[in-house]
Amino acid sequence: MSNLKLWEGRFSKSTAQIFDLFNASIMTDIKLFEYDILGSVAHVKMLAKCNIIREDEAKLIIDSLYQILEDFKLGKIVFGISDEDVHMLIEKELIKRIGEVGKKVHTARSRNDQVALDERLFCREKNLYLQELIKTLINTITTLAEENIDVIMPGFTHLQKAQPILFSHYILAYAQMLKRDLLRLRHNYSMTNSSPLGSAALAGTTFEIDRFFVASELGFESVTENSVDTVSDRDFILEMLFSLAMIQMHLSRLAEDFIIFNTDEFKFIELDDSFCSGSSIMPQKKNPDALELIRGKTGRVYADLIGLLTVLKGLPLSYNKDLQEDKEFLFDSIETVEMSLIVINEILKTLKIDKENMVNSCKSGFINATDLADYLVTKGVPFRDAHFIVGNIVKYCIESDKTLEDLSLEEYKRFCEKIQEDVYQFIKIETCVNRRKSYGGTSLESVRKQIDNLKEFLNKLK
């Protein structure tokens, strides 16, 4: 029985062994085992409801399916290449256990709509789990921001010191990225949440089935509208892969920042030993391997998205075997992003912030130059003129090896007579930060508002 092809009636010879090996997806789609069982249970209930099979037959099939699932979880189901795919494995196991009645499970169904159902069930569950991981990470970031709310650091553009900002403001930028990721996943969920079952091979079925009953049983909001589209559609997987690529990209940017900030050249942060490794030859090394892996794995997540896009690029309607390739892309990306989210959350929870080095780093690089230009504007100087004047002042400071704070009032007045004693208070780093009260800015007041808004956002999702 185990070597039987359930579709072999039309064929006069067995498939080649090398083709069996090439064709089989069982070692990949075995991850869909439980979803396939749940889909079959709902399908059989519908067949009985519509008087396509008897109630006693449905009960026997359903009881056996649940027992097969239990045995699978206990490791009692043996499978291999000859089983071809997860659908055939389960159906053969069912027939082996209950005989002729088991052969009725596939009535009014094709593997084409069956696998689409399994994948939608899988994506829904994984989507919800990813949402929870992101919520957890946003909470961790919010806590880190609150604990270091008034720590000042340089903000960077072009990897050069630009303007002083609060560390809390900086780290909350990643919370905003993750917020968008969360909203994107929620949209993905709604796009996935339509039941494909009942579309059969491509044209629907001649049996008088109730697709809406199956959808309700499995918690879908609706049913798909066109059977040809349904069995060939993998948009919901593409959208999931795009969302995963975006998430991983955001994590990669954070990883890159922290890799830089963790160096001796910056010393803004210190990574916990538990997320670093050493060198096989250099005894002094403490390498940020966890962050580097998050950064490195971004490439494979991108590749999964591009891979499936390429598979779908030239497919004619409707179903084609090419679609079997979608699962490796999907499973790989989900596992990679899940692990990355978990790891980076733990890194943030164990992170040490070097407040002194951060604020000391603000003393060089003329990061208060923009504020000096703003000061001149308050004295009636047009901004473009103020920009030019401050550019000359910075050039003078570089040549004189001075900071803006080092200049005397007399030196300032060489460049602009409107500069007064109050300039020194205006260009203090703390003043530079806390004057930026525009909505979404880096002032303490603004950052507190950002934290409150994030908490409110997360609470509304509960």
Swiss-Prot record:
Gene designation per UniProt: argH
Localization (cell): Cytoplasm
Pathway(s) annotated for this protein in UniProt: Amino-acid biosynthesis; L-arginine biosynthesis; L-arginine from L-ornithine and carbamoyl phosphate: step 3/3
Family statement drawn from the similarity comment of this UniProt entry: Belongs to the lyase 1 family. Argininosuccinate lyase subfamily.
Entry's Gene Ontology cellular component terms: cytosol
CDD domains in UniProt: Argininosuccinate_lyase
BP terms from Gene Ontology: arginine biosynthetic process via ornithine; L-arginine biosynthetic process
Pfam families documented for this protein: ASL_C2 (PF14698), Lyase_1 (PF00206)
NCBIfam families for the chain: argH (TIGR00838)
Gene Ontology MF term list: argininosuccinate lyase activity
Xref: HAMAP family: Arg_succ_lyase
UniProt name for this protein: Argininosuccinate lyase
UniProt catalytic activity: 2-(N(omega)-L-arginino)succinate = fumarate + L-arginine
Keyword terms of this UniProt record: Amino-acid biosynthesis, Arginine biosynthesis, Cytoplasm, Lyase
Enzyme Commission number(s) of this protein: 4.3.2.1
